[in-house]
């Protein structure tokens, strides 16, 4: 990710990866990082330079393992292929944006991770708060919330009328089960056997404690069927939706 205005303050080039790792070690006041993520892919980044840098950081002890985040399945496959061919450190975990509102990773990313033995730790299981059902369709979001602040990323992704309506249906089902919509959503992610764990993103201590309570809820087949009915496997909650930060690149018009 970009961490400044300089030309070498972003991307997956060797200089920036090395510098960013050293900066992280200094800020964390530690000798090594357990898992160092390539947080997003830059498809024009030299694959060999990127992967060999991760291997160098591993061999010199600055990181124990590295992972991939927001990588397309074909890029995951390319990284694994290069690592195997050149006997360098392999990625051990993938961090996709995956929740009951966005099931697109089920098409290629999750099967690829399973095939290559890569752990999966999805982020944003609550769809930036939408799956807590605290946002009512047609009602202004509460002050102090992410939507209430008109967060740009949320407004261009999760905060859609279709998603808000689905969250209310999940809430009604969850309450009949004696739990909350948020707890249901977290457990839905964990109920996928391909997933290793899940990344929680609480903003307050109360939110963190509420995350932990989610583990007390036992997911069942009826919950799985509900989400399948509301959001078909492999699809987002809104037909035709795609995150503008991660556009599809499979069409290059000859004339436009």
Residue ranges: model-predicted function:
Residues 1, 72, 98-102, 124-131, ...:
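Glycine-rich beta-alpha junction loops
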Residues 60-61, 116, 177:
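Helix C-cap/helix->beta junction micro-motif
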Residues 12-14, 83-87, 110-112, 137-141, ...:
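Short, hinge-like loop/turn segments at secondary-structure boundaries
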Residues 143-176, 191-195, 205, 209-256:
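Terminal-tail/helix-coil boundary detector
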Residues 182-185, 197-201:
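Conserved active-site loop/cleft motifs that coordinate metal ions or position small ligands
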């Amino acid at each position: 990710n970009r961490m400044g205005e300089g030309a070498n303050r972003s991307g997956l080039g060797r200089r920036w990866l090395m510098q960013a790792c050293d900066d992280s070690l200094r800020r964390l006041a530690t000798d090594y990082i357990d898992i160092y993520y390539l947080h997003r892919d830059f498809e024009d980044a030299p694959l060999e330079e990127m992967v060999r840098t991760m291997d160098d950081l591993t061999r010199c002890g600055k990181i124990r393992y590295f992972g991939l985040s927001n990588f397309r399945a074909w890029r995951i496959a390319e990284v694994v292929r290069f690592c195997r061919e050149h006997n360098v450190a392999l990625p051990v975990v993938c961090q996709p944006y995956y929740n009951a509102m966005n099931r697109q990773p089920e098409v290629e990313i999750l099967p690829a991770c399973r095939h290559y033995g890569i752990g999966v730790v999805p982020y944003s299981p609550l769809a930036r708060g939408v799956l807590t059902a605290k946002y009512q369709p047609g009602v202004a979001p509460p002050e102090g919330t992410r939507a209430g602040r008109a967060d740009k990323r949320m407004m261009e992704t999760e905060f859609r009328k279709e998603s808000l309506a689905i969250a209310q249906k999940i809430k009604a089902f969850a309450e009949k089960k004696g739990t909350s919509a948020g707890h249901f959503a977290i457990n839905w992610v964990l109920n996928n056997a391909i997933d290793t764990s899940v990344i929680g993103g609480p903003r307050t201590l109360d939110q963190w404690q509420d995350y932990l309570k989610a583990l007390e809820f036992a997911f069942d087949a009826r919950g799985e069927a509900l989400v399948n009915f509301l959001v078909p496997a492999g699809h987002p909650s809104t037909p035709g939706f795609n995150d503008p930060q991660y556009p599809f690149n499979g069409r290059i018009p000859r004339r436009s």
